[in-house]
């Protein structure tokens, strides 16, 4: 997969800038990259982006994903993860996006947390759009991805560097 151009849309300018620098370091300037700041909660902004740039493929990775934080802020998890995903799906469908890939999580399998529930609902939205639009939609589930923001791996690394112990969020959790 080699895109003709790449559009990075993120609410956090620092993360978007870091990604831009990483892409330019690894791939040079062979692929034109445009960075835009905005939120998937803002349907109007999404429509502006789709109308201006006409993307054909969307990789959707935006989400609140820290399990303990979402347990104490469940409404924010729903607004960002579920409603934001719905906004993005609707805008993509309205602007003739051909393929939509949602990055999900292993926590969406028989969810036991607010975050897991929101991601499972997002997967169900993906299934609905896949069955009712011309857009090819898929959700892919990942576990803890090394080097990703919000992964438990950096926490484990820091605990190990300090000599332990390595702790889990819940003593009953199995990983």
Model-derived features: positions:
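Short beta-strand element of Class I
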Residues: 4-7
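NAD(P)-dependent short-chain dehydrogenase/reductase
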Residues: 24, 90-93, 114-175
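A short helix-to-beta-strand connector/capping loop
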Residues: 28-33, 133-135
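Conserved Rossmann-fold NAD(P)-dependent oxidoreductase catalytic core, especially the SDR/UDP-sugar
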Residues: 54, 60-123, 128-130
């Amino acid at each position: 997969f080699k895109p003709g151009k790449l559009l990075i849309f993120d609410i956090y300018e620092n993360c978007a800038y870091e990604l831009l620098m990483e892409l330019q370091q690894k791939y040079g300037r062979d692929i034109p990259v445009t960075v835009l700041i905005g939120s998937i909660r803002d349907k109007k902004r999404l429509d502006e982006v789709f109308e201006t740039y006409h993307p054909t493929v969307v990789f959707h990775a935006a989400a609140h994903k820290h399990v303990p934080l979402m347990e104490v802020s469940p409404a924010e998890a729903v607004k960002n993860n579920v409603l934001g995903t719905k906004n993005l799906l609707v805008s993509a469908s309205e602007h003739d996006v051909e393929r939509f890939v949602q990055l999900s999580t292993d926590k969406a399998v028989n969810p036991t947390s607010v975050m897991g529930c929101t991601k499972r609902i997002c997967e169900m939205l993906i299934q609905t759009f896949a069955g009712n639009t011309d857009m090819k939609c898929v959700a892919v589930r990942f576990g803890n991805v090394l080097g990703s923001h919000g992964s438990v791996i950096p926490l484990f690394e820091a605990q190990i560097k300090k000599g332990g112990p390595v702790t889990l969020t819940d003593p009953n959790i199995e990983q």
